[in-house]
Every structure is written in structure tokens, then in C-alpha cells.
Amino acid sequence: MAVRIRLKRFGAKKRPFYRIVVADSRSPRDGRFIDEIGYYNPIAQPAEIKIDVEKAKKWLSVGAQPSDTVKSLFKKEGIIGNSVSQ
């Protein structure tokens, strides 16, 4: 089972709010997920990011691959360095 760390969209039209979730790569964007590890609110000024660092590191250690957007959020929060390969 390929596991991805990605964003699950919530919020109203043109007012997105995202939860950072761990999900099977085959499930739909807003479908079933395995674990929720945080949230991201791009509308707030500055953008609001809350990530459970322990859960994120645990999932990365067992092989979960972050999406490009989640990878950039992890870099902003200092969870991963710049030398992480795909």
C-alpha cells in the first residue's frame, strides 16, 4: 500500500482550509484517510500552519511520501531538511 501525506480540502467556495492527512495514494482527495497530522489555513495572514511533529516524523520514518505542497510546508516548519529525495 503506497501511503501519501497530503492535503484534504475543507472550507467554503473560494475560502479553502486544508487538513494534513496520511492516506492511501489510491483514495480520492477528500476520501478516506489513515491519520490526521495537522492543518493549513492559507487564507489567514500570515498563513496558519499547525503540524504534529511527532506524528509527521513517525509517518515519514515508515515510508510515507509527502506531496509537493506538504513537503514545502514541512520545510517551512523545519520537519524535513532540503536534502530529502523523492
UniProtKB/Swiss-Prot annotation:
HAMAP family: Ribosomal_bS16. Transmembrane segments: none annotated. GO terms for cellular component: cytoplasm; small ribosomal subunit. The gene is rpsP. GO terms for biological process: translation. Keywords: Ribonucleoprotein, Ribosomal protein. It comes from the Bacteria. PANTHER family: 30S RIBOSOMAL PROTEIN S16 (PTHR12919), SMALL RIBOSOMAL SUBUNIT PROTEIN BS16M (PTHR12919:SF20). InterPro entries: Ribosomal_bS16, Ribosomal_bS16_CS, Ribosomal_bS16_dom_sf. SUPFAM superfamilies: Ribosomal protein S16. The keyword Ribonucleoprotein applies. Belongs to the bacterial ribosomal protein bS16 family. One of its GO terms (molecular function) is structural constituent of ribosome. This is Small ribosomal subunit protein bS16. It comes from Thermoanaerobacter sp. (strain X514). The lineage of its organism: Bacteria, Bacillati, Bacillota, Clostridia, Thermoanaerobacterales.
